[in-house]
């Protein structure tokens, strides 16, 4: 640590990097906790606290330099963004995608089932007449692929996606057909 303390630029860099690492862990741990991954969250929190103690120690030992506090705050901000990007890549959990279409001829439910998605569909009535409504549950990592697939098949479909909090019964209890979902390319539709 004496090498870092002797060089003010190294000190700034160390404080910044340590705080980015700390807040990244903090953000990921919070998201893991909210999604119910409590044991993984506990392991991440152990690493988080170790990093926090080191970073805070560096700042507290050098409070007389305002730039160190700025580096700490910037590291905090960047850490939030990095943590959120990591969570996006992990894509934990499931999404419910609701699709409303007026085009019955496309037989969208059958096409999506053939691609491995579980689809529940039913008739509905909107301002402009009869519609077909579909409810599709998909792992979050396939949400964008599903949205692209729907746009390829029916570009006028009305689509809403939201996070599913609790699952019980139905298609997903039998097992996700992830291999089938991964196997197709949206350009081939």
Curated annotation (Swiss-Prot):
Stated family: Belongs to the UPF0316 family.
Top-level lineage group: Bacteria
GO cellular component, as recorded: plasma membrane
One Pfam family recorded for the sequence: DUF5698
Chain coiled-coil ranges: none
HAMAP family: UPF0316
Membrane topology, record value: Multi-pass membrane protein
Subcellular location: Cell membrane
Principal location: membrane
Protein name stated in the entry: UPF0316 protein Sca_1484
Sorted UniProt keywords: Cell membrane, Membrane, Transmembrane, Transmembrane helix
Segments crossing the lipid bilayer: 8-28, 40-60, 66-86
């Amino acid at each position: 640590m004496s090498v870092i303390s002797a060089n003010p630029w190294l000190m700034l860099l160390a404080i910044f990097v340590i705080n980015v690492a700390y807040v990244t862990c903090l953000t990921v741990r919070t998201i893991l906790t909210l999604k119910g991954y409590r044991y993984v969250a506990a392991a991440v929190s152990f690493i988080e606290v170790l990093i926090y103690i080191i970073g805070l120690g560096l700042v507290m030992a050098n409070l007389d330099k305002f730039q160190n506090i700025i580096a700490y705050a910037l590291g905090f901000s960047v850490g939030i963004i990095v943590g959120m990007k990591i969570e996006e890549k992990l894509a934990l959990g499931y999404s419910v995608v609701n699709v409303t279409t007026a085009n019955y001829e496309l037989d969208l439910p059958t096409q999506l089932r053939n691609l491995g998605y579980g689809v529940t569909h039913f008739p509905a009535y909107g301002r402009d007449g009869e519609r077909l409504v579909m409810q599709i549950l998909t792992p979050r990592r396939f949400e964008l692929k599903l949205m692209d697939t729907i746009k390829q098949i029916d570009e006028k479909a009305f689509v809403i996606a939201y996070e599913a909090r609790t699952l019980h019964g139905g298609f997903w209890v039998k097992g996700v057909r992830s291999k089938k979902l991964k196997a197709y390319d949206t350009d081939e539709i």
